[in-house]
Structures are given as C-alpha cells and as structure tokens.
Amino acid sequence: MEVKIFNYLPDDAQMIRQKVFVDEQGFKQEFDKIDDFADHFVLYDGSEPIATFRIFNGEKQGEYVLGRLAVIKEYRGKNIGSDILSEAEKIVLNKKGKSIVLHAQCRAKNFYAKSGYVEFGEIGEEEGLPHIWMKKQL
C-alpha cells in the first residue's frame, strides 16, 4: 500500500469521499473551502484508491486538524483506519506538530479513543449527525 500526498483535492480523494460521505451516509455538503488549502492524502492498494484524509493547520501553534478520513467499504475491517491515524501522526510530527484534533462522528469516537484520542467540548451536529471534538497530544 502506498500513500500519496497532494496540495489540492485530487479526483481519487473526491471519489472516495463521494462514495462514503455522500452516497453511503447522506451528507450533502461534503466539499468545502478547507479543501482549497488542506493537504490531501490518498492510500492506494496497487493502483486502486481505497482511503483518504486531509490535514490542515489548527487554531493553536503546533496543532493540526485531521478530517474527512474515509475508507471505501470493501476495505473496512482491515485496520486501514488505524494505519491512517498512525500515518497522520507521523506526518504531523514531521511538521513539528504537537497535537491533532478532529471532529468525529459520535458513532466513531471509540475507534479514535483506541488510538489515544480524548473527547473535549460539547457534542454538536453536522447535517443532523452528532459529532464530538477529539484531541491527541503527540
């Protein structure tokens, strides 16, 4: 498996996010202005794009935001999500980052907690789906 980095939203990342967040989960406002300045990452199995995420600077010095982590259905349950978190943490450390924050769907918070992410703040909604902020010090 190979991770490719883009400073723009590539078609492969767009396709994965469309499948996962729009087609499967029903989000209507999946793509936003953050896509214009975030670094985008796509994980490939051979030439097949199978997962994506984005990273951008947070509000505080040394803080980075991880978002739009998506794995296509056929590859779920194979620890790819956990591998992505590890890769994202390495990327942030290479940028001299000190922490990662993310806005997790509440149904996925245990997945992030297993990797050391801790909840903070209030539960909010994005398009009617509960989300919680989570953070990990690196």
Where are the language model's segments positioned?
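Conserved active-site tyrosine of GNAT-family acetyltransferases
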Residues: 17, 112, 117
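Short acidic/glycine-enriched loop/turn segments that link adjacent beta-strands
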Residues: 36-37, 60, 126-130
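Conserved catalytic-core motifs of GNAT/GCN5-like acyltransferases
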Residues: 103, 118-133
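A short beta-loop-alpha structural element at the N-terminal edge
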Residues: 1-13
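Conserved GNAT acetyl-CoA-binding A-motif
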Residues: 85, 91-105
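Conserved acetyl-CoA-binding loop-helix of GNAT-fold acetyltransferases
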Residues: 71, 77-90
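Conserved beta-strand in the GNAT
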Residues: 42, 48-57, 63-70
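Helix-loop element at the rim of GNAT/NAT acetyltransferase active sites that forms part
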Residues: 15-28
